[in-house]
């Protein structure tokens, strides 16, 4: 989608009085969409899934982007304290059961918001993984929410060019070889063959679970 097409689609949602929110991981690849939205929708809620395991650099970058773009940030956190997120052997779930860890810290905390809103905007791109390649620009999500993926057909090159054009900052870990940045325990440096392979390294896992329900 072009920027104009994104704007037109969001205007349709607004005319229909649909309640809209966006989720963002606040990586460099997130900033193009956030910049576009900040120029279209005033006071849109930007949900950040604050797991408590993020790199300090991610939190700093998030705060910088929020201030730069004038975003309304909502920290979404698990009801289960981090210290209690351990299995019967005392291991953190990110070690013994990463799927359950993602459920506790991402999927479950977001569910109440899915029931309150009509449209969920996400910056997933088809070139990020095989799972995301199967997604559509607009499709039905859980709790009858509309999933809108305006950046789905954008490439990493387009994101970069947009960022350069608008002089937008990059995540400080990019220069250190981290291109897909999530929680500290589950993030490794970039593998050119698969952008998402830097996440959950060695676990045969490239998605946290927020988007897998869209793939049939």
Question: Model-derived features: where do they sit?
Answer:
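Nucleotide-activated chemistry modules centered on ATP-dependent adenylation/adenylyltransferase
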Residues: 1-216
């Amino acid at each position: 989608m072009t920027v104009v097409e994104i704007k037109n689609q969001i205007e349709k949602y607004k005319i229909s009085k649909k309640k809209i929110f966006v989720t963002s991981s606040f990586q460099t690849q997130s900033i193009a969409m956030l910049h576009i939205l900040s120029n279209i929708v005033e006071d849109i809620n930007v949900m950040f899934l604050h797991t408590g395991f993020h790199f300090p650099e991610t939190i700093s970058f998030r705060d910088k982007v929020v201030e730069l773009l004038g975003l309304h940030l909502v920290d979404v956190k698990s009801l289960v304290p981090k210290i209690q997120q351990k299995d019967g052997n005392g291991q953190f779930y990110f070690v013994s059961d990463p799927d359950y860890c993602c459920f506790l810290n991402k999927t479950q905390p977001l569910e109440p918001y899915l029931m309150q809103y009509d449209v969920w905007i996400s910056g997933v791109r088809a070139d990020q993984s095989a799972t995301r390649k199967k997604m559509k620009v607009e499709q039905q999500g859980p709790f009858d929410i509309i999933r809108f993926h305006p950046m789905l057909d954008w490439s990493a090159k387009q994101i970069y060019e947009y960022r350069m054009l608008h002089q937008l900052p990059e995540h400080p870990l990019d220069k250190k070889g981290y291109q897909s940045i999530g929680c500290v325990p589950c993030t490794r440096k970039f593998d050119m063959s698969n952008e998402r392979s830097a996440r959950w390294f060695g676990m045969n896992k490239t998605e946290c679970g927020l988007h897998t329900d869209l793939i049939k």
